[in-house]
Amino acid sequence: MAHLRGFANQHSRVDPEELFTKLDRIGKGSFGEVYKGIDNRTKEVVAIKIIDLEEAEDEIEDIQQEITVLSQCDSPYITRYFGSYLKSTKLWIIMEYLGGGSALDLLKPGPLEETYIATILREILKGLDYLHSERKIHRDIKAANVLLSEQGDVKLADFGVAGQLTDTQIKRNTFVGTPFWMAPEVIKQSAYDFKADIWSLGITAIELAKGEPPNSDLHPMRVLFLIPKNSPPTLEGHHSKPFKEFVEACLNKDPRFRPTAKELLKHKFITRYTKKTSFLTELIDRYKRWRSEGHGEESSSEDSDIDGDPEDGEQGPIWTFPPTIRPSPHGKLHKGTALHGPQKSAEPVKRQPRSQCLSTLVRPVFGELKEKHKQSGGGVGALEELENAFSLAEESCPGISDKLMAHLVERVQRFSHSRNHLTSTR
């Protein structure tokens, strides 16, 4: 309970259940649930994200980071944050309600026309232009993190891994994001800046066109090896030349030659193909019809074992927690975290150099291996010992696992290059 003391603030004694009424659950993830709710004082519809801090101890720094970043943002293209309340071990985060679902939801009934895609990308670019002007990097741009209001307004969400660029820290080298959307320089743990978001936007553009990002049929670990090694993905198929050129501009492997968000807003694909955001309500209506016809009832989520899951309701989830590589916290929540509404002067969160690959790569891979061994009748003792060795090494030398992974990636890339060279000379 010691880490909860950092949440002490003027709202800690206020019972959020007196201020807000919970309605249907509209989202669920590994460390929280989201409800549609009502602000009893204003009767305004809100989204209520409830997190059990005791169960989400490993994600506390992500939660703090999301609150810190959102409390500093004031833009129509960023999900609005109204405040946070602590009741026992439950943290209530009050957010703007966006009932149109995510851009990923809107892809489920079928492919999108380029006019819809360009309009969504334009609004994402406006959000990125704002963030980058505030020296912030989102670091996890993808369709699942783009939410829409019922009127078609498009807003960026999920700032748990967002980063702050300070005057003395022009580029970051933290290994975070979602593998399929990650820029090469992020995977290589080189210094990077807001241009990493532009790469992720290019992958998101392909996702909006094809329904999934490139390499989605591969294991995320394999993708981490391939992205720095291979040529950039391209938009294949019957798409307009401006759209293909837009994607190509975003997916330049050299971040110096990627355009900024402001420059991309002037790209001909954006200027020629877009419409008003109200046009996107057609996609929202299409998704609602698709759901009402009984599609998408079976959830592939690991959390689908809860009875009567309201995520299958008419609106669909407006807040999801997809697999993302996030910095693993070494410390707990710092005292003075903004929990009671916007505070523009909040300091950037300082992260300890713990290895992110433990929770995002090592443990999932060991989990898959152990499951396969169990199915084939084999033992898992040796695998558990090896997995524990990673944890022990991390305790004595924080960050060592990430260094190991970086060397493995480099070694595999060199091996693949040498093998390809030998094959070509035979």
Curated annotation (Swiss-Prot):
Residues 20-270 form the Protein kinase domain. Its EC number is 2.7.11.1. Its cofactor is Mg(2+). The active site is at 140 (proton acceptor). It comes from the Eukaryota. The keyword Iron does not apply. It catalyses: L-seryl-[protein] + ATP = O-phospho-L-seryl-[protein] + ADP + H(+); L-threonyl-[protein] + ATP = O-phospho-L-threonyl-[protein] + ADP + H(+). GO terms for molecular function: ATP binding; metal ion binding; protein serine kinase activity; protein serine/threonine kinase activity. Keywords: ATP-binding, Cytoplasm, Golgi apparatus, Kinase, Magnesium, Metal-binding, Nucleotide-binding, Phosphoprotein, Serine/threonine-protein kinase, Transferase. ATP binds at residues 26-34, 49. Residues 299-314 have a biased composition (Acidic residues). It is found in: Cytoplasm; Golgi apparatus. SUPFAM superfamilies: Protein kinase-like (PK-like). Interaction with Golgi matrix protein GOLGA2 leads to autophosphorylation on Thr-174, possibly as a consequence of stabilization of dimer formation. The C-terminal non-catalytic region inhibits the kinase activity. The modification Phosphoserine is found at residue 278. It holds the Pfam family PDCD10_N. It is an enzyme of class 2 (transferase). PANTHER family: SERINE_THREONINE-PROTEIN KINASE 25 (PTHR48012:SF9), STERILE20-LIKE KINASE, ISOFORM B-RELATED (PTHR48012). Homodimer. Interacts with CTTNBP2NL. Part of the core of STRIPAK complexes composed of PP2A catalytic and scaffolding subunits, the striatins (PP2A regulatory subunits), the striatin-associated proteins MOB4, STRIP1 and STRIP2, PDCD10 and members of the STE20 kinases, such as STK24 and STK26. Interacts with TAOK3 (via N-terminus); the interaction promotes STK25 abundance at the level of protein expression and/or stability. This is Serine/threonine-protein kinase 25. The lineage of its organism: Eukaryota, Metazoa, Chordata, Craniata, Vertebrata.
